[in-house]
Regions:
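N-terminal Sec-pathway targeting helices
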Residues: 1-15
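A short, charged/proline- and glycine-enriched loop
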Residues: 36-40, 92-95
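Short beta-strand element of the alpha/beta-hydrolase
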Residues: 39-47
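Gly/Ala-rich beta-loop-alpha elbow adjacent to hydrolase catalytic centers
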Residues: 135-140, 144
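Primarily recognizes the serine-hydrolase "nucleophile elbow" in alpha/beta-hydrolase
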Residues: 148-150
């Protein structure tokens, strides 16, 4: 009698565990397919007094999630000159660009907007980008807004 009692419980546990495995795998597969592969770069703009290090956590998480494998950095000097670090292969999809302003405490947002334009011109000349996405924090939002105003 005791032996017959355990079989249904064991069967129930196996079914629940098997169902959980199937559902979790399905959710994982769906999560990896929730993005679109494009050639459009996403620029990350840091906040006041910050640097590319603040952006690295986000870009590394995106790479770890499998959305892209391509991250470069655009460093803007105090005179507005842009230097690209790293390179994007032609096959790159969903490329990420960490934008770093060396003058990271410049409160002249109009100037920062011009410097962002310099970054975009450099990216366009180097890679032919015509569109971009942006993720910005604090001063980065104002920089983006002033770029769009000019």
């Amino acid at each position: 009698m005791k032996r017959k009692f355990w079989w249904p419980i064991l069967l129930l546990v196996v079914l629940i565990f098997g169902g959980w495995l199937i559902v979790s795998q399905s959710l994982r597969d769906n999560a990896s397919q929730q993005y679109e592969k494009t050639k459009v770069p996403t620029l990350f703009l840091h906040g006041y007094g910050s640097s590319h290090r603040a952006e690295e956590h986000m870009t590394q998480a995106i790479v770890k999630a499998g959305v892209t494998q391509n991250v470069i950095r655009a460093t803007v000097s105090k005179d507005g000159t842009v230097k690209l670090q790293g390179a994007l292969p032609q096959s790159a999809y969903n490329p990420l660009v960490e934008v770093e302003f060396e003058d990271n405490k410049n409160a002249n947002y109009r100037q920062n907007g011009v410097w962002l334009k310099n970054v975009l011109v450099k990216l366009q000349k180097t890679y032919g980008f015509k569109k971009f996405n942006a993720v910005a924090h604090s001063m980065g939002n104002l920089t983006l807004a002033y770029y769009m105003l000019d």
